[in-house]
């Protein structure tokens, strides 16, 4: 299946000069969504990625991370932006182009030495994925891989990630 054909391009969003890759058209296609999850599962198995937990980065990482966790027999844990989780959290601040942001996970969500796979819909500059990796490693988890639906290769985000398997299904 040609997944790229299911992604809609929206020029000048969210600002002029940006070409936004919109996955809502992929998500609404039942066969495309099923194929995406099955293909990501297959790629993880081929790379021998066997996580205890799949970490989904807010918010579109939740969409793909939950069914992937189910397929891999793993638990699912959301990584949220600051202030979205009700219990005590581990957190990490990271730099954005114009400022900083913060990611959080419940303190009781991950056990030391847990094997984790980080999933998101897209990798661009790698900032959010890199911060997520640092957060789970700070907790004492073993990072076993990354899974992305889309990778924007020109932005070279993967060079900022740890040396573990990195799966991307669609490349631009």
UniProtKB/Swiss-Prot annotation:
CDD domains: PRTases_typeI (cd06223). It comes from the Bacteria. Its EC number is 2.4.2.7. Keywords: Cytoplasm, Glycosyltransferase, Purine salvage, Transferase. InterPro entries: Ade_phspho_trans, PRibTrfase_dom, PRTase-like, UPRTase/APRTase. Transmembrane segments: none annotated. It holds the Pfam family Pribosyltran. It catalyses: AMP + diphosphate = 5-phospho-alpha-D-ribose 1-diphosphate + adenine. Catalyzes a salvage reaction resulting in the formation of AMP, that is energically less costly than de novo synthesis. This is Adenine phosphoribosyltransferase. It comes from Nostoc punctiforme (strain ATCC 29133 / PCC 73102). The gene is apt.
């Amino acid at each position: 299946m040609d997944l790229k054909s299911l992604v809609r391009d929206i020029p000048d969003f969210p600002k002029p000069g940006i070409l936004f890759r919109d996955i809502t058209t992929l998500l609404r296609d039942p066969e495309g969504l099923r194929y995406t999850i099955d293909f990501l599962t297959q790629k993880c198995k081929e790379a021998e990625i066997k996580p205890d937990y799949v970490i989904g980065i807010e918010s579109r990482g939740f969409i793909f991370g939950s069914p992937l966790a189910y397929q891999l027999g793993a638990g699912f844990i959301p990584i949220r932006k600051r202030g979205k989780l009700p219990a005590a959290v581990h957190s990490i601040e990271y730099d954005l182009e114009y400022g900083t942001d913060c990611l959080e996970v419940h303190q009781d969500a991950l056990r030391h030495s847990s094997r984790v796979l980080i999933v998101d819909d897209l990798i661009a500059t790698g900032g959010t994925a890199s911060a997520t990796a640092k957060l789970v490693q700070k907790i004492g988890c073993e990072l076993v891989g990354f899974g992305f639906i889309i990778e924007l290769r020109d932005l070279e985000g993967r060079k900022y990630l740890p040396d573990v398997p990195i799966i991307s299904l669609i490349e631009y």
